[in-house]
Amino acid sequence: MHFVLSVAVTLKDEAKVLARLKPGVAAPFTFPKAPTLPKARFDHPPVVVGAGPAGLFAALTLARAGVQPILIERGKPVEERTKSVQMMQEQGILDPESNVQFGEGGAGAFSDGKLTTGTKSPLIRTVLQTFVDHGAPEDILYIAKPHVGTDLLKGVVRSMRQEIIQLGGQVRFDTRLTGLMMRGESMEGIMVLCGGETQEIRTDTVILAIGHSARDTMQTLFRQGVRMEQKPFAMGVRIEHPQALISQSQYGKCWTHPALKAADYKLAVHTPDGRGTYTFCMCPGGEVIAAASQPDGLCVNGMSYHARAGENANSALLVGVRPEDFGDDHPPVSYTHLRAHETRSNL
């Protein structure tokens, strides 16, 4: 067994050292700088819909630019949301507006807190640093597979909300988008449902960060003419195994060494028809949790706490679903297709 490390070092005479080394051994490196945010002005506060990762970062960025945004979220703040999730796990009682999918932090808040992307964006460092500034472990800045953990991520999310408010922004929970107020092609505001009453929020700028599971909101937006297009997605099941089995398989005879953390894995295969099947969101030392957001549905997800000290490991086993599988290029057909598979699976 061996380990692969990439190390960044600071040297007095970098050019001299590089000249002595063989090509490919080392190269100059500079951490990407965080973008400078220009101060912006709007006639009305911009509205961000959804307090998942995209919405939180959008609202935080606007707040840092001096804009004082309004962030609305149909679910509850993470403190109250935790109680709703516990009620579902322990008693099987679902709150359709506050669950593993809906609420502050989005689905990721109760889904392990792995930070992963297939891109090489220079903004990655800024995102990771923001998490650290709000309480995430500093090691996410340099480990290959950064992981916060569900237990720590809740505090990070709460801290990000507090910064938005301190900078003059608003965060409104239990507030669901029900429609856009348009005059021709111009945005004049949005309609929301809050406390059982319909309210209007005047704005000319709306950022939609509604996530994966707000299908009612997606259908409303489509009926109002918001441009949408079908895209590939994946669906599948969760597989679970003893963590000892995975660690022994990956580490061999060294698997019990105290310096080694719970092992993970990633598998992928392309079937003869070209469709991909692969594992995703592997949770070492984690658990499978109930993750439904609809009263008539059954869904599971995987998560780990920061220590990853549980007895079992789990992973999603997914298969790709392509737009040509839907049989129609009408955007809502993709939801109908997905719903049909979900219904058959539940039955």
Identify the function of each model-found stretch.
Residues 230-321:
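Mid-to-C-terminal "cap/lid" subdomains and adjacent gly/pro-rich loops that border
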Residues 67-85:
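Glycine-rich FAD pyrophosphate-binding loop
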Residues 1-5, 80, 86-170, 175-176, ...:
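Conserved N-terminal/central alpha/beta ligand/cofactor-binding core
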Residues 49, 201-211:
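Short hydrophobic core segments
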Residues 173-186:
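A conserved short coil-to-beta-strand element within the FAD-binding core of flavoproteins
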Residues 213-223:
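Flavin (primarily FAD) binding-site architecture
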Residues 336-343:
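Conserved small/polar residues in nucleotide/adenosyl-binding loops
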Residues 42-51:
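Beta1/beta-strand and adjacent pyrophosphate-binding region of the FAD-binding site
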